[in-house]
Amino acid sequence: MGGISIWQLLIIAVIVVLLFGTKKLRGIGSDLGSAVKGFKKAMSEEESNSAANQKDADFETKNLEQAKTNASAEVKKDKEQA
């Protein structure tokens, strides 16, 4: 009752073709398709770039052993200064 039937859709399609013509509709379709293709390509390039350059932080990570030796060296310096 309130929905659009197939006949109404066909009438709308015929009116659109008469207004714009088949060449213009084909051109719009190809432009839209190339835009979607370019968007997908850019998204896939961005994902590959971000995966390759992804870091947890901006500084270099240190070994746990190095952190312990650096901490003990700092404690020794603090004791010597005091």
From Swiss-Prot:
GO cellular component: TAT protein transport complex
GO MF annotation, one: protein transmembrane transporter activity
GO biological process, one term: protein transport by the Tat complex
Membrane topology, as annotated: Single-pass membrane protein
Compartment(s) where it occurs, according to its Swiss-Prot or TrEMBL record: Cell inner membrane
Keyword Transmembrane helix: yes
Listed transmembrane segments: 1-21
Record has Protein transport as a keyword: yes
Annotated Gene3D superfamilies: 1.20.5.3310
InterPro entries for the chain: TatA/B/E, TatA/E
UniProt keyword list: Cell inner membrane, Cell membrane, Membrane, Protein transport, Translocation, Transmembrane, Transmembrane helix, Transport
A Pfam family reported for this protein in Swiss-Prot or TrEMBL: TatA_B_E
Record text on subunit structure and interactions: The Tat system comprises two distinct complexes: a TatABC complex, containing multiple copies of TatA, TatB and TatC subunits, and a separate TatA complex, containing only TatA subunits. Substrates initially bind to the TatABC complex, which probably triggers association of the separate TatA complex to form the active translocon.
Function field: Part of the twin-arginine translocation (Tat) system that transports large folded proteins containing a characteristic twin-arginine motif in their signal peptide across membranes. TatA could form the protein-conducting channel of the Tat system.
Protein family according to the UniProt entry: Belongs to the TatA/E family.
Record-linked HAMAP family: TatA_E
NCBIfam families linked: PRK02958.1, PRK04598.1, tatAE
The name this protein goes by in its record: Sec-independent protein translocase protein TatA
Organism: Vibrio cholerae serotype O1 (strain ATCC 39315 / El Tor Inaba N16961)
